[in-house]
């Protein structure tokens, strides 16, 4: 018997980085089809209800969205399960707030508050550069955009800076040794560092060696790396901790120091 697409998602099967409590019900919101993969996105309902606390219930979220109060990348979105993903800009003009979705060092989405000027652009990783009919060049980005007539210097894995009002390329960052990157997949998700080395393996994955601000080195796959700035200066504001992953002992010491400071105060 033929079966169509599943329209539901069990809460225990939802991505861990959504941080849903087990006892909050049997089901979780299933992301709609969109620019990001279902396991690598955060539906709008979770942003409004669970993260920003602007709504208490599912119905309140629908009411807010239907009043066209929420914009993603400069466009009004009324779909409650629209999949917002890495680097997306969420704007709420009514409150004058803007947020950029980034990862913390534990691989969870963080809503990083940004200024109005920073909310006007977005960084996009280039997936491929191709030629269409009549030899027209175009590039594809990680979030499903297609942009025609890009600069010929731009290649796959580079990062482009897009003006969200005009949807045109303002600037770009080459994927080169010495540029700052953020890891978007694997066990090092959310870590920020500078590319030190690039290992090419024919017939296998390319390995990228990265060094963070404290001098710790780690390696990850090429597909997990997203260039976010030239040199060691990122073009976007980073979450608390600046993408530096602490060891378990370092985290404990940090908590103890904070508790001691609070006790003394």
Swiss-Prot record:
Superkingdom classification of source: Eukaryota
The keyword Cytoplasm is assigned to this record: yes
Compartment(s) where it occurs, according to its Swiss-Prot or TrEMBL record: Cytoplasm
Keyword Repressor: no
Gene Ontology biological process terms from the UniProt entry: translation
Record SMART domains: KOW (SM00739), S4 (SM00363)
Signal peptide, first to last residue: none
Pfam families: 40S_S4_C, KOW, Ribosomal_S4e, RS4NT, S4
A GO CC term attached to the entry: cytosolic small ribosomal subunit
UniProt GO MF annotations: RNA binding; rRNA binding; structural constituent of ribosome
InterPro entries: KOW, Rib_uL2_dom2, Ribosomal_eS4, Ribosomal_eS4_C, Ribosomal_eS4_central_region, Ribosomal_eS4_central_sf, Ribosomal_eS4_KOW, Ribosomal_eS4_N
Primary location class: cytoplasm
Keywords: Cytoplasm, Ribonucleoprotein, Ribosomal protein, RNA-binding, rRNA-binding
Residue stretches making up the S4 RNA-binding domain: 42-104
Family assignment from sequence similarity: Belongs to the eukaryotic ribosomal protein eS4 family.
Name of protein: Small ribosomal subunit protein eS4
Phylogenetic lineage: Eukaryota, Viridiplantae, Streptophyta, Embryophyta, Tracheophyta
Underlying gene: RPS4
